[in-house]
């Protein structure tokens, strides 16, 4: 009974002591705060800190002594989060005192965990299928391969990357031009997949020397490549792909001591000659990739990236099968909505005119290996600063039929935030001063008649202007002179005039890859073409000779059609207002994730 009476007495005294100590501490802190603004305060502050330290040590000792379940030896180096000393240290200035570093995170991320996110992991990778088939395959022929290689090499969109994977680079001269010109920035380079066994640490799969073309995949890097393996797919490709040594390149890259494993590939193309558009073959090729990754026994704390032209439509059943088969996470998609876009990319529209826009290119991260905190895929639509020409005169500013894709953790100042495909003189419209109606292409036929017959702007009233004799693809100022006028809705369909045995001679329509060579635009207000400029169009009559102006026909069944008719005098039927497109380029800056 005596013991029971003594225990509560002891506790009450203990709490009283604590209450007194806390009261003294509070008073000291208030005094410390009040003196902090006065001159000659340092001696007072030192005295108070000494008192606080004494009180704190006393409290800590009492805690240890009074605990019935504490092993004193286990608490010698343990920090008490609620101790006065800990709070005092946190409140004291630390940026100028290296002797008092902040305590480490009590729950650090395990960098070896497959699902961990390491703050210091960082890689920037670009994938681009650049459509450079060899000329010995007659179905492709001249694609401006060497001209485009020159422009890609000097472009800004390939700058500031750690790694680039090129696909579709099977043209030998174009390959030499491109790789040599970017060697100073990307000195570590693989050979192209499927051409030779030289330069590889290993060649696996069904390599053969008989195909007409190599596999077209090349990886270049800013950082040392420690291992290079080429793998040729173990299945028979179909359609055009049967002539290629298709497979993938594997590289192990050392970036400042960190290892990154990259697989770059171009899977079976989506061809109508193939059973189910080649899906069965692509599944087998994905199996080859997954089996190879498994066989490498890559450490779980190293990043594995699978990238390239996978020819699998985003959002399709095949896409989700791919995500599952490769055991990868879906990236965060930003940028333009398609990588093969027949509505915006003239080269894609030229060769795949009947295809709808689709997304086919990816940079994916293996789930079984190191995981970044976030992984973004940005599809971007750059154009060349200068135009290029094919041997037949076809002129373009596209780098490829595909748009490139960037893979990265966090966006930075070099990350594209807006569409690069918006030229100043794209999607312009022309309004007749005669009837106040806009010129438009036919709604039902790509090669239909041009008419000034609508008061409403639509996709059919928009046209792209290009002066083929000017090398600059996107001039800030376009003057009077020869011009190619292309329907913005029907890419590669240009203004031309008709001549034949039927009615409609000298009437204008849009014709595939065949614009009038002598068509010109005249700015009646002089200077640069700008919004609201009054313009007239002229062309050469190859039948009767001489230049004539285009006019809006004003009667009969051909009313409101455009004809090459007036030779000298300009009336309201020959004059049009030019309207520039005021819509801003697509902006995805708010969709990007930046590191804060």
UniProtKB/Swiss-Prot annotation:
Coiled-coil regions listed: none
Low complexity bias spans: 83-118
UniProt feature, compositional bias: Polar residues: 67-76
GO molecular function per UniProt: sphingomyelin phosphodiesterase activity
UniProt superkingdom: Bacteria
Compartment list: Secreted
Catalytic activity: a sphingomyelin + H2O = phosphocholine + an N-acylsphing-4-enine + H(+)
Pfam families attached to this UniProt entry: Exo_endo_phos
Keywords, comma-separated and alphabetical: Hydrolase, Secreted, Signal
EC number: 3.1.4.12
Signal keyword on record: yes
Cleavable signal peptide: 1-36
One GO cellular component term noted in the UniProt record for this chain: extracellular region
UniProt cross-references to InterPro entries, sorted A to Z: Endo/exonu/phosph_ase_sf (IPR036691), Endo/exonuclease/phosphatase (IPR005135), Sph/SMPD2-like (IPR038772), Sphingomyelinase/PLipase_C (IPR017766)
Region feature (Disordered): 63-118
Keyword check for Signal: yes
CDD domains documented for this protein: nSMase
EC class (word): hydrolase
Protein name from the UniProt record: Sphingomyelinase C 1
Organism of origin: Leptospira interrogans serogroup Icterohaemorrhagiae serovar copenhageni (strain Fiocruz L1-130)
